[in-house]
């Protein structure tokens, strides 16, 4: 009897976390099925230490998230942005057999010695072909500019709307950050009939903490499965801080390129920069055509100081504004000011 009581006590007191799908997520990847592993305990999100973390644990996680088969166990520190210092490591180790339906069914060990340098990561095959990489995965449509409008997400090269059920200012903050549009503006505005979407409603019950880098990092209800109507489409308004200038040249149409973000001017790294990007800048400034300056000419304006805001900018050349081009997250780069972009336009 004593042995039976001890066994029952051990089972009932084994540490665990929420078994619902919203209690587990992957953060920082190109889609919702890869990234740093985070779990929820008592309403707080935290990371999992990689002690003993292996492909069997990832297999269970991928199954729980509906992300197909496990494809890898990358380190969690590879994903940006990194876990915040105040965010706790909640689980020391997870030990799954690989047959469980959720991580909550696996053996877990409470944290005693682990830092964010040891955060676990996971990569799944993701048969749903989730969101495209940032910034193409989300947009604000039918609004007065790039930073106001109906929220739409991209799935398999089609745009779909998002139901406002479960939507919050925290989710709006994520969208505005993802689009490089500054802070989210608190608004009670809803889509009018003219701004209703016509595509299927893809997401509902968004549950963002506000710290996510992209909307696809936020837990949500099942994709494509909801009871919403288009009069419940989500509308978001952000500050629109995007502006650019050329400094250090003889006129307003030549110089080192700087962009305005969050009220601060910063430079742009020249990784992948070329003639198409020059064309968009000249077009936006009303400065005629790009003169495609030589490497030497580009360097004559000197390095900037302060922030480097953009890196890996990619334009097709058809954009009307640099904000419509693809780029890394604002502020993320591997550059120095010796790589600052300079542009010379015909004027």
Swiss-Prot record:
Entry GO CC: blood microparticle; cell surface; cytoplasm; extracellular region; extracellular space; plasma membrane
Signal peptide: 1-19
All residue ranges annotated as the SRCR domain in the record: 24-125, 138-239, 244-346
GO annotation, biological process: apoptotic process; cellular defense response; immune system process; inflammatory response; positive regulation of complement-dependent cytotoxicity; regulation of complement activation
Tissue expr: Expressed in spleen, lymph node, thymus, bone marrow, and fetal liver, but not in non-lymphoid tissues.
PTM text: Not N-glycosylated. Probably not O-glycosylated.
Parts of the chain that traverse the membrane: none
Superkingdom per UniProt: Eukaryota
SUPFAM superfamilies named in the record: SRCR-like (SSF56487)
Keyword line: Apoptosis, Cytoplasm, Disulfide bond, Glycoprotein, Immunity, Inflammatory response, Repeat, Secreted, Signal
Pfam families: SRCR (PF00530)
Subcellular locations according to the entry: Secreted; Cytoplasm
SMART domains the UniProt entry points to: SR
Keyword Cell wall biogenesis/degradation applies: no
Disulfide bridge map: 33-67, 49-114, 62-124, 96-106, 163-228, 176-238, 208-218, 253-287, 269-335, 282-345, 315-325
InterPro entries xref list: SRCR (IPR001190), SRCR-like_dom_sf (IPR036772)
Principal location class: secreted
Subunit structure: Interacts with FASN; the interaction is direct. Interacts (via SRCR2 and SRCR3) with pentameric IgM (via Fc region); disulfide-linked.
Record function comment: Secreted protein that acts as a key regulator of lipid synthesis: mainly expressed by macrophages in lymphoid and inflamed tissues and regulates mechanisms in inflammatory responses, such as infection or atherosclerosis. Able to inhibit lipid droplet size in adipocytes. Following incorporation into mature adipocytes via CD36-mediated endocytosis, associates with cytosolic FASN, inhibiting fatty acid synthase activity and leading to lipolysis, the degradation of triacylglycerols into glycerol and free fatty acids (FFA).
Protein name: CD5 antigen-like
Gene from which the chain derives: CD5L
């Amino acid at each position: 009897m004593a042995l039976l009581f001890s066994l029952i006590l051990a089972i009932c007191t084994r540490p665990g976390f929420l078994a619902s799908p919203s209690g587990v997520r992957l953060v920082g990847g190109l889609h919702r099925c890869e990234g740093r592993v985070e779990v929820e305990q008592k309403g707080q999100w935290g990371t999992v230490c990689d002690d003993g973390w292996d492909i069997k644990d990832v297999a269970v996680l991928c199954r729980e998230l509906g992300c197909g088969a496990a494809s890898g166990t990358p380190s969690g520190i590879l994903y940006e942005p990194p876990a915040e210092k105040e965010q706790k490591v909640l689980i020391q180790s997870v030990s799954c057999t690989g047959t469980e339906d959720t991580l909550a069914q696996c053996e877990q060990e409470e944290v005693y010695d682990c830092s964010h340098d040891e955060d676990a990561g996971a990569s799944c095959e993701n048969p749903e072909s989730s969101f495209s990489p940032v910034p193409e995965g989300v947009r604000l449509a039918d609004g007065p500019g790039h930073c106001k409008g109906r929220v739409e997400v991209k799935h398999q090269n089609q745009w779909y709307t998002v139901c406002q059920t479960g939507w919050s200012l925290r989710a709006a903050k994520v969208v505005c950050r993802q689009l490089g549009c500054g802070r989210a503006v608190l608004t009670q505005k809803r889509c009018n009939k003219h701004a209703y979407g016509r595509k299927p409603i893809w997401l509902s019950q968004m549950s963002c903490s506000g710290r996510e880098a992209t909307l696809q990092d936020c837990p949500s209800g099942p994709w494509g499965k909801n009871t919403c109507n288009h009069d419940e489409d989500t509308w978001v308004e952000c500050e629109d801080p995007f502006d650019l200038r050329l400094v250090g040249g003889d006129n307003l149409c030549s110089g080192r390129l700087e962009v305005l973000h969050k009220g601060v001017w910063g430079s742009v790294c020249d990784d992948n920069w070329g003639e198409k990007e020059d064309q968009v800048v000249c077009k936006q400034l009303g400065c005629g055509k790009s003169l495609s300056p030589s490497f030497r000419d580009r360097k004559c304006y000197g390095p900037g100081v302060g922030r480097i805001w953009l890196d890996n900018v990619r334009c097709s050349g058809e954009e009307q504004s640099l904000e419509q081009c693809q780029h890394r997250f604002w502020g993320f780069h591997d550059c120095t000011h010796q790589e600052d972009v300079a542009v010379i336009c015909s004027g």
